[in-house]
Swiss-Prot record:
One Pfam family recorded for the sequence: DUF3194
Organism encoding this protein: Pyrococcus horikoshii (strain ATCC 700860 / DSM 12428 / JCM 9974 / NBRC 100139 / OT-3)
InterPro entries xrefs: DUF3194 (IPR024502), MTH677-like_sf (IPR035954)
UniProt region (Disordered), positions on chain: 97-116
Residue ranges, compositional bias (Basic and acidic residues): 100-116
Highest taxon in the source lineage: Archaea
Stated name of the protein: Uncharacterized protein PH0533
Annotated family: Belongs to the UPF0440 family.
């Protein structure tokens, strides 16, 4: 479980919450496929749950199945991907708190290796 970080975030719209989940999922998927070939992944599921109350709670769950002959520590890879996603989302939220939502999305795309 990640720690609570207070950044003075305003109430977010439903679209912004969906975007945060999308950013987190994209970062995780990109990170996994930076380390594994698509042919090495039998199944993958990435779930983002967001709850906005007094705080914004983001819960990420990742499941990756690889064939037995693929020599990779899947749990470590998943942990690293989730950490990366939280870092990118935190930077994006800090930009939103400062009123720079578009720059935060661009930074998230750059950090995940994607660009428009």
């Amino acid at each position: 479980m990640r720690k609570v970080i207070h950044i003075g975030l305003p109430k977010l719209s439903e679209e912004e919450l969906i975007e945060i989940g999308d950013i987190a999922q994209r970062v995780i998927i990109d990170y996994i496929f930076e380390h594994l070939a698509k042919s090495e992944v039998r199944d993958m599921e990435v779930t983002a749950r967001i709850n906005q109350g007094e705080t914004l709670d983001l819960e990420l769950e990742v499941y990756v199945e690889v064939p037995i002959f693929v020599r990779v520590d899947v749990e470590s890879l998943i942990d690293e991907a989730i950490d990366k996603a939280y870092e990118v989302v935190e930077r994006h939220l800090r930009k939103l708190a400062k009123g720079k939502g578009n720059e935060g999305r661009e930074e998230a795309e750059e950090a995940s290796g994607k660009s428009k």
